[in-house]
Each structure stands twice: as C-alpha cells, then as structure tokens.
C-alpha cells in the first residue's frame, strides 16, 4: 500500500522539493546508502544542467534566426523602397529601436504594404506595356503574342508616367487612324451602293477585319490597310465618273427618242432613274444603284429598242390610247366596239391620209370626253354596286331562312346569325336604294338626253324588271305561307283532339319550308328561275339590245336572287317605274 501511495501523488503539489523529499522517503524505505544517494543526486543535477544547456542553445539559435529575418526584412525593405521610389518611404518605422521581435513587428506591416504596392505597380506597368505593344502591333500590321517583361528594379511613378504618356500618344494615333479607316470604309460603302457593287466583298479584299460583323476597335489600322483603302476609293470614284458620263449620254438619247415619238409620261417614268441624273455632277449622285451596271445596260437596251421601233411606234401609241379609252369605258360600264375602232386606226395609219399627230390629238380628245362621261356616271355606278351587293345579301338571307338548322349550336352558327341580322338591315334599305337610283338615273338621262346603259342594258329597264320580279317573288312567298297553314291545320286539330304530346309522325321542326321553295318549283308548276345581270342573260331579256349582241364582254355577276323570265314574258309584262313595284324586304 505504501508503494501505491508514493506512485500517485497529487499533480498539483509536485515541485522539485516535494520530489526530492519523496525520493528521500523511498531511499529510506529501500535502504539506499549515502554513496548511492550522492551518486544519484549528482546524476540528477547533471541531467538538469544538460536541459538548461539545450534550452540556452535553442534560444541562441532562435535569436540568430530572428536577427537574420530582421536583416532580410531590412534588406527587402530597402530594395522595395528603391524600386518604388522616394514617395513610398513614408510610414517606414525606425529599425534600430526596441527588441528584435518589436523591430520585426514594426517592419512587417510596412513590408506587407510595400509588397502590395509593388504587385499593384507591376500590374499597372504590365497593363500599360501590353497596350503599348498591342497598338504598336496594330500600326505595324503584325500581331504579337509575347507577354511584355516588366523591369521590377524600377517601378517608380515617374517611369509609369512615361509609359502612360507614350500610351496616350499611341491611343491618339490609333484613334486618328481608326477615324480615317471608318471614313474610307463609309466612302467605299456609299460608292459601292451607287455603283451597285458588293460592299462586303470589296472591303474584305482590302482587309478581312473591315466587314460589318467586326467591332470597330478590332478593325485594321495598319499602314498597308490605309494605303489599300485610299487606292480602292480612288478606283471607285473613277469608275463612278465614267459610269455617270455613260448614263448621261444614254439619258440624252432617250429623251430625244421620246420627244421624237411622243412617248407618254407613264413610259418615260419607267426610266426616271436614268434621266434624273442627266445634269448631275459626280458628287450629287448618291442614290443607291443609280449607276449600277445593269441599269446602264438596261438603258442601252432601251435606246436600241427605241431606235428599231421608230417606224412602227405610231401604231403602238395609237393602240395604247385606244386601250386607255376602252379601259375608261369598261370601268364606266359603257359598251363599245373595240374591234372596229382598232380596224379604223390601222386603216388610217396604213393609208397615210392622216397625219399621226392629228390622229393622236383626236384620240386624246376622245379620251378626255370619255373621262368626263365616266365622272358623270360615277355616282350612279357606285349606287348600282351597292344595290347589287344588297341583292346578293338578300339572296343569301333567303337561303339562310330556308335552313332548318340555322339556330343549331353548330360551329360558326353565331357568325351566320350576326350576318343575317346585318343582311336584314341591308335588305330593308333596298327599296330606298332603288328609289334613289331611279331618280338619279332619270335626272342623268334628262341632263344628257340619252339612255343610261349599264354594260349595254338600260338601267331603268333593269330596275323596273327587278321591282316586278321582287313583287312576284313576294306574292309567291305569301301563297306558300298560306298553303303551309292549310297543310298544317289537320295535324293541329288531331293533336288537340287526341293528345297534347307530339306524335312521332309530326314534323320535327315547325320552321321547315313546305312548298315549291323546297323543291325549286312553284305551287302550280311554275318554274322558279334566277335572273343574272351578265352579258349572256341580259341579251335574252333586254328590249334595248339586238338578239345577237356580243357575249364576251366581262361584267360583274348579277344578284343571285333574281327570278329569270323569258323574252316573251318580259315583252308582254307592263314596264313601269321601279317605285311602282317595290315591296317590303323579306325578313
């Protein structure tokens, strides 16, 4: 138990004295001799001396290392201050005061700050030198991939300012060169546009970087590029001058030929792009394509063509004027005989009994009169078109009203319903349209002392016939409604007598059309026919035209709701004013 107690002393009470006392107690218990005890004590003392000695050596070594570190720091500090310049010496502490660690602690922040300044200064020098090297390469026309070497022995602000001044001069030179390049490129673009040349291929032949996709700062500014651009501009200007001279010569020839053959303005306008520059200077021609090669070739071809057509030009002019006259009459729905008119022109020109100028003047007079007549007919023709459109809607409305499924929920039914509402409103205006049309037509006939014909058919006769046929149609519809009531009466009586429920044999819809409308026949066998206002059918019913009238004249389609009648019926029917035959519009 005693040994255990000696091996477990309280750690907090261990000192050299307690350990020595403990050792004495152990020796006493063991019975060590005094010699042995002295020997062990000497051994302990020697070991303590060795420990102290090692600690002293370690401390001396650490001091030497600190001194070396301090020396290196001072040397580095001196090197940095010399490299960065005198202005960087501000804030450096006194190196000879305080302990070694204090001196190191004082130098470390300044040294770190100087290192940061050096790194920043190196980056600035590298950036400036890289820009200088790049601009010099751009001017020389070569690309250099070498990284600039920064002389770290001299990083002073003075040297940095020198580099920056050099960079500013180079940047100014680059800006001037870039401005010249852009001016040249813009000039080339304008010249290529006027000459009809491919701008992209032209500038890329000078240098690939001059295309529109390359950024401005990436365009070549080398001496060679500027020289080639200047030569290109000079070449294009010479080409522009030569082409303008050629075009002006052709324009003069064209004008002479036009004046000789009295070419109309419409044909001359086709070559306005040629004649517009007849008195322009080189600098005044700026319209894109104005001097294109194909345009000059086109003018040359036209001059050659006009030279060859001098003899036969008068016939062409006369026929063009005749076509213009026929077009005016066609738009005004006035029937003419173009074949006989053209034969007359041919005979007059071939006979040589009339001067070409007199013939053209006479045709111009006819054209003027035709325009006046067309203008006087315009109001009535516009109303005829509205009337025909209303009749078309009336025909559609009748077909719509006969449709048993018009109120179903099918796709597009609501659109037809809206159209039907608009059609009913429009159809209700037909009587007023006819009244106004009749009044204006009669006033026109009184003023001009002639019948107003629409594609050869007297308009009043058309309106009278329309009113009569509309009245007949209303009477037929009224008769069909009465017949329908008579046919449905037995079914109603049977249902009221036997049952209130609908019979399986009862018609599904009360709106079903019964009678001749359903089978395109009348109640008494009368055939329900359509009247068309085209040339063929008008010829069969018009009292103002011959039976063999021409059937090839193009006219607008007639309303599809007319009921056609034969010549004999039309001839035997009394003809009166349209107002006498107007009836209310169908619902």
UniProtKB/Swiss-Prot annotation:
Keywords: Cell cycle, Cell division, Coiled coil, Cytoplasm, Cytoskeleton, Microtubule, Mitosis, Nucleus, Phosphoprotein. Residues 474-587 are annotated as: Disordered. It is found in: Nucleus; Cytoplasm; Cytoplasm, Cytoskeleton, Spindle; Cytoplasm, Cytoskeleton, Phragmoplast. GO terms for cellular component: cell cortex; microtubule; nucleus; phragmoplast; spindle. Its main location: nucleus. The modification Phosphothreonine is found at residues 526, 543, 552. Induction: Expressed throughout the cell cycle. Residues 46-84, 151-181, 234-257, 290-317, 461-489 form a coiled coil. Basal phosphorylation at all stages of the cell cycle. MT-binding properties inhibited by hyperphosphorylation mediated by CDKs and/or MAPKs (e.g. ANP2, ANP3, MPK4 and MPK6) during prometaphase and metaphase. Residues 474-494, 543-553 have a biased composition (Basic and acidic residues). Microtubule-associated protein that bundle and stabilize adjacent microtubules (MT) of the cell cortex. Enhances MT nucleation. Can also bind to tubulin dimers and promotes their polymerization. Confers MT resistance to the drug propyzamide and cold conditions. Plays a role in the central spindle at anaphase to early cytokinesis but is not essential at the midline of the phragmoplast at later stages. Represses metaphase spindle organization and the transition to anaphase in dephosphorylated active form. Promotes the formation of a planar network of antiparallel microtubules. Forms dimer. Binds to MT, mostly with coaligned MT, both between parallel or antiparallel, forming thick bundles. Interacts with the alpha-tubulin subunit of the tubulin heterodimer. Bundles polymerized MT via the formation of 25-nm crossbridges at specific stages of the cell cycle (e.g. bundles microtubules in interphase, anaphase and telophase but does not bind microtubules in prophase or metaphase), at the plus-end, the minus-end, or along the entire length of MT, and along phragmoplast MT. Interacts with SH3P1 and MPK4. This is 65-kDa microtubule-associated protein 1. The gene is MAP65-1.
